[in-house]
A protein has these predicted regions:
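Extracellular/surface-exposed low-complexity repeats and stalk/linker segments enriched in Gly/Pro
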Residues: 2-43, 47-51, 59-65
């Protein structure tokens, strides 16, 4: 499974519809990683191509949906 590297400050929504910034998810890193305390343990990343990836705490990285 490929890791997803965030190369810009893309908008990220949790599954409650709250918009987060990449820095809040990955700190100073360029890689987006799952965080704890999110609703249902999942994050949804919408890229500039419109794809949505789901980050799950169990497998660590997301699969494009």
């Amino acid at each position: 499974m490929a890791k997803i590297r965030v190369i810009s400050d893309l908008p990220v929504m949790d599954d409650s519809g709250n918009i987060l910034h990449v820095q809040e998810l990955a700190g100073n890193s360029n890689e987006s990683k799952p965080t704890t305390g999110m609703a249902n343990g999942s994050l949804y990343l919408e890229t500039d191509t419109g794809l949505i990836s789901v980050f799950d705490e169990d497998d660590g990285w997301g699969t494009p949906q």
